Amino acid sequence: MMNKDGVKIVTIGGGSSYTPELVEGFIKRYDHLPVKELWLVDIEAGREKLETVGALAKRMVKKAGVPMKIILSYDRREALKDADFVTT
């Protein structure tokens, strides 16, 4: 359930080329859906893509000035703990 500090969202397949568009949507709607943590999760074989997309997502968030933390992970179980929403 969403708390006053914002939500934790986990994106399975975070190395996808569609992820930056998702991040842009969260940034634009931050006032209505404050995302405090966005976990981008992918498989080990997708490491290079996840790192590239994750770096872009971090730059987007920094430029927008929203207090959203981008976390990259290859461990679904860790990422899904206490998640408010999950996207795939």
Where are these regions (language model features)?
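Metallocofactor- and cofactor-centric catalytic cores in central/energy metabolism, strongly enriched
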Residues: 2-88
